[in-house]
Amino acid sequence: GVHAAEDNVIRLALVGCGGRGSGAAANALSSSSGPTRLVAMADVFEDRLKGSYNALQGQFKEQVDVPPERRFVGFDAYRKAIDAVGPGGVMIQATHSAFRPLHVGHAIEKGVHVFMEKSFAPDPAGTRRILQIADQAKQKNLKIGCGLMCRHSSARQAMIGKIREGALGQIVLIRAYRMDAGIRLEPFPGNQSEVLWQLRRPYAFLWVS
């Protein structure tokens, strides 16, 4: 199960310490469904990890137990965080979707439950991998929770129920739009790692997000 046997505390590892990851960790630490403790953090960028740690430590001092040796930076940091939380713990996976299949697969392999944000992968191959991992999780009795917030909205569920009952008649076409400020991308300056530069600008590169 998700609960650690010795003290019933749910151990959390945060992988991806940006705004969404920090928010998801805060949600988990403020949950009323069980005692929770953040024990490991991982990110490619040290500044993101530091900012997230300071914010969470300030808000949940008694529940954030992440000493320097359990704050991991780099592309392999996710492995160290998953190992630190251990079997039965929970990984909060909130990186950009390029890394989701790799990280979630490793967590399930190590016996760690997963909460992952959307989107689940940037391409069909990654999506198929996530579906394969889901089957593996079922076989191991591990849980994968997904951040599809609209599916948890009772108002939206009621609206969809009405549509399915025919309240709008026969639907022949649906168009959905999202209004956004748009993406501005400056030229690559050439004085740093281009991969890291692209990761800082995820919405400009399809492979990242």
Q: Language-model segments: which ranges?
A:
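N-terminal glycine-/serine-/threonine-rich beta1-alpha1-beta2 phosphate-ribose binding loop
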Residues: 1-112, 125, 129-141
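Predominantly a Rossmann-like dinucleotide-binding segment in NAD(P)-dependent oxidoreductases
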Residues: 16-21, 140-145, 150-209
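Hydrophobic residues within beta-strands of alpha/beta enzymes
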Residues: 91, 114, 171-174
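A cross-family glycoside hydrolase active-site/sugar-binding cleft signature
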Residues: 94, 117, 145-147
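Short helix/strand-capping hinge loops at secondary-structure junctions
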Residues: 111-113, 117-119
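Conserved PLP phosphate-binding loop immediately N-terminal to the Schiff-base lysine helix
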Residues: 123-125, 154
